């Protein structure tokens, strides 16, 4: 039979139980025993959900308290000295300190002396974030975290057939960074492999037959030294007990296909959603003894699978492989919401088009059954339902809109170009804005308090009238403006109290989007996002932000930034359509945002920020495909931004990003000011400016908003001095790394006091 399995399952829970438990624990409202009980209950529920869906081999080790890469760092004892316990093995407090920075806890204790958090960055080209391992030249590895073995025991006690999931040694090293002296982290491989050996020995002793080893870097452009290291590593790993399935996903193997096919392991998983073209070659080149796991159901989207189309390929594979064929989602279902059945308010038509993690498991299991029992009545009924749904979706009037198509067809190159070059624009902007040297600002959002969330919820439930809700939001805006005035910030924001999410807020006001109530996915730690779903052609029926920003500007003589989310980020942080290209969807969004930008300018707003936090996230994993993406992504931004006069200043913001290799394309966006995340990486991003003279203004973030830790002004001033060595003072801005939505007011004000003080200190020093 064709075995069905899952590469991983969402860990947050159908109702975000893990998020709530983590935050209660961090506030001192839930002790460690209570937190662990929630985790154990969720794991049991998730295994049962997958088993009930028909999955034969369940993943174990996909659960993590914060992040799976961080869990591996603890397992391997890769703990930076600033977090290392004085005695004994690491604890959950150690893990959370590494993730969030070390702060005093609510019960009065503290960990790690106020150490700053580890760097966080995007997991390949997804919107999930992982904690970057920090390696030292004298790095030693030791098995120091028992979580995987405890969870295998839990699953076995519940009677499940399990497949532990490990991040492979090459991918783990690739994801990390060297700290301190000059060395190559690949040289650490031989020290790391014995720990993997110990893990396999322990798992074999627990009765484990198969282990999934995730090596997604096999879909990247790998240096030859890393390719050689794969052969070296797996020649050693093959000696260890347990059968081993190498899992690749997020792209095609391409030039690494021969390497992956011939590694001395027992099976290989490939992603045929992202890279269907690799199927014939891998089928021909896979050794006759190996299992081939085909990722046929999209683990990163919410659309139902085209069962008939997928089954056609699987039948061919089944004829060739027989019992060596396994069926799976394309990747871990971490990137999918948990269960569509929780959605009790979606219209029936849209709901029939969707599938979340539970339903994707059902699809995987159905495909396996269809190979073994094609005439089974339940299989035939499911295939017929799939046909009906796809036909209905293709014919639906909510998808195609002639007026949007007409606007797209009318786009010309001049529509994506400002009136004058930056040098001319900036002179007019400086005359208009009259800002000091090193102007201070924030990225946009201020803390979303419980009062704000309650007001929004009450308004949605009809408990507050529109007028009452507007006044509640006006009060929040007044507070935000007053705080900023008192702090002495130079360019203000209205705080975004009225916005539930930087994408969903706009998506709710655009035609072509749909929304779920429980479509949450994990972004990092306890942070969950609920991506909107792009269903059809996109357009803006009316202004979205103008009245809020006008109100805020009326409260101050200082410039008030209009705050918008850019077309690429709107696309990347939504679940996109599958029937048209990302480029087309980005252009539709750009036209909608362009209309809003023009309306803000007409309302007297002199600075408009178009956030492109996800710009680099959209970059293809293979460099050969970069330029095509960068061309349409930069054009979409310019299309959104270029409808204004020269004296209107366009800002953009990008976060969690390594831009050294795409700095020219960022310059091609031609934003007047760009603010970027740099503090966690100690201004490492600014190395790009040593070889590329970035022409416009830039605000490198001077403190990390993802941690509750408040850095002092001296620390921020130190980062500014580093920045000033690479960026001319007259083009340097001072700002946090990102928006302040997830922080509390006391730490927000404390950090901004220090930030303004640092800017004033640098003005005095360097002016």
Curated annotation (Swiss-Prot):
The UniProt annotation places 5-methyltetrahydropteroyltri-L-glutamate binding at 16-19, 122, 527-528, 573, 617
Show the InterPro entries listed in the entry.
Cbl-indep_Met_Synth_N (IPR013215), Cobalamin-indep_Met_synthase (IPR006276), Met_Synth_C/arc (IPR002629), UROD/MetE-like_sf (IPR038071)
What does the record say about how the cofactor binds? Binds 1 zinc ion per subunit.
Q: Which cofactor does it need?
A: Zn(2+)
Q: Which Pfam families match?
A: Meth_synt_1, Meth_synt_2
Kindly state which keywords UniProt assigns to this record, in alphabetical order.
Answer: Amino-acid biosynthesis, Metal-binding, Methionine biosynthesis, Methyltransferase, Repeat, Transferase, Zinc
Which Gene3D superfamilies did the record assign? 3.20.20.210
Q: Which residues make up the binding site for L-methionine? A: 443-445, 496, 611
Q: Which family does it belong to?
A: Belongs to the vitamin-B12 independent methionine synthase family.
The record's NCBIfam families line, in alphabetical order, gives:
met_syn_B12ind, PRK05222.1
Record protein name field = 5-methyltetrahydropteroyltriglutamate--homocysteine methyltransferase
This chain's source organism reads Ectopseudomonas mendocina (strain ymp) (Pseudomonas mendocina)
């Amino acid at each position: 039979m064709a075995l069905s399995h899952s590469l991983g399952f969402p860990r947050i829970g159908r109702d975000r139980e893990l998020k709530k438990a983590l935050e209660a624990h961090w506030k001192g409202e839930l002790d460690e025993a209570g937190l662990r009980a929630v985790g154990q209950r969720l794991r049991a529920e998730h295994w049962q959900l997958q088993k009930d869906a028909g999955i034969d081999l369940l993943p174990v080790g996909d659960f993590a308290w914060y992040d799976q890469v961080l869990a591996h760092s603890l397992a391997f004892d890769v703990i930076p000295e600033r977090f290392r316990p004085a005695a004994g093995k690491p604890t959950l407090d150690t893990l959370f300190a590494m993730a969030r920075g070390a702060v005093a806890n609510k019960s009065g204790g503290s960990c790690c002396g106020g150490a700053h958090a580890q760097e966080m960055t995007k997991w390949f080209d997804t919107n999930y974030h992982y904690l970057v391992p920090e390696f030292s030249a004298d790095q030693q590895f030791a098995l120091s975290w028992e979580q995987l073995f405890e969870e295998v025991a839990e699953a076995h006690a519940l009677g499940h057939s399990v497949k532990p999931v490990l991040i492979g040694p090459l991918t783990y090293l690739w994801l990390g960074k060297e700290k301190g002296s000059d060395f190559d982290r690949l040289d650490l491989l031989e020290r790391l492999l014995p720990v993997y050996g110990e893990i396999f020995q322990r798992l074999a002793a627990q009765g484990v037959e198969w282990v999934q080893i995730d090596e997604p870097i096999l879909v990247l452009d790998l240096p030859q030294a890393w390719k050689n290291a794969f052969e070296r590593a797996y020649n050693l790993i093959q000696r260890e007990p347990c059968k081993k399935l190498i899992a690749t996903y997020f792209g095609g193997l391409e030039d690494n296909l021969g390497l992956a096919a011939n590694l001395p392991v027992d099976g290989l998983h490939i992603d045929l959603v992202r890279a269907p073209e690799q199927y014939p070659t891998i089928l021909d080149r896979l050794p006759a003894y190996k299992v081939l796991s085909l990722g046929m159901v999209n683990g990163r989207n919410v659309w139902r699978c085209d069962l008939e189309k997928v089954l056609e390929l699987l039948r061919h594979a089944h004829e060739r492989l027989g019992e060596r064929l396994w069926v799976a989602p394309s990747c871990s279902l971490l990137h999918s919401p948990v269960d569509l059945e929780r959605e009790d308010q979606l219209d029936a038509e849209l709901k029939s088009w969707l599938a979340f993690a539970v339903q994707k498991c059902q699809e995987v299991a159905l495909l396996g059954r269809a190979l073994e029992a094609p005439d089974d009545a339940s299989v035939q009924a499911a295939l017929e339902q799939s046909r009906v749904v796809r036909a209905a979706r293709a014919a639906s009037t909510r998808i195609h809109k002639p007026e949007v198509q007409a606007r797209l067809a009318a786009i010309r190159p001049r529509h994506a170009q400002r009136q004058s070059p930056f040098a001319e624009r900036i002179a007019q902007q400086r005359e208009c804005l009259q800002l000091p040297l090193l102007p201070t600002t924030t990225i946009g959002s201020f803390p979303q308090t419980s009062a704000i969330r309650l007001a929004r919820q009450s308004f949605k439930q009809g408990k507050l009238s529109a007028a009452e809700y507007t006044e509640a939001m006006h009060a929040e805006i007044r507070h935000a403006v007053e705080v900023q005035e008192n702090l002495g910030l130079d360019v203000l924001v209205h705080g975004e109290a009225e916005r539930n999410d930087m994408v969903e807020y706009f998506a709710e006001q655009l035609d072509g989007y749909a929304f779920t109530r429980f479509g949450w996915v994990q972004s990092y730690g306890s942070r969950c996002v609920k991506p909107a779903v792009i269903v059809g052609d996109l357009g803006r029926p009316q202004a979205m932000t103008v009245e809020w920003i006008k109100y805020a500007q009326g409260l101050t003589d200082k410039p008030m930034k209009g705050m918008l989310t850019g077309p690429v980020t709107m696309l990347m942080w939504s679940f996109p359509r599958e029937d048209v290209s990302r480029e087309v969807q980005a252009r539709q969004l750009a036209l909608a945002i362009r209309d809003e930008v023009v309306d803000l300018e007409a309302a007297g707003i002199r600075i408009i920020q178009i956030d492109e936090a996800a710009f680099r996230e959209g970059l293809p994993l293979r460099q050969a495909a970069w330029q095509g993406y960068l061309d349409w992504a930069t054009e979409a931004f310019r299309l959104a931004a270029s409808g204004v006069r020269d004296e209107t200043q366009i800002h953009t913001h990008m976060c969690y990003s390594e831009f050294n290799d795409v700095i020219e394309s960022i310059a091609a966006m031609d934003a007047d000011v760009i603010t970027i995340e740099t503090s966690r990486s100690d201004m490492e991003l600014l190395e790009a400016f040593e070889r590329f003279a970035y022409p416009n203004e830039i605000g490198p973030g001077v403190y990390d908003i993802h941690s509750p830790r408040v850095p002092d002004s001296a620390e921020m001033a130190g980062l500014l001095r580093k920045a000033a060595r690479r960026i001319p003072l007259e083009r340097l801005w001072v700002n946090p790394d990102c928006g302040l939505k997830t922080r509390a007011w006391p730490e927000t004000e404390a950090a901004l006091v220090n930030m303004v003080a640092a800017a004033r200190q640098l003005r005095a020093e360097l002016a």
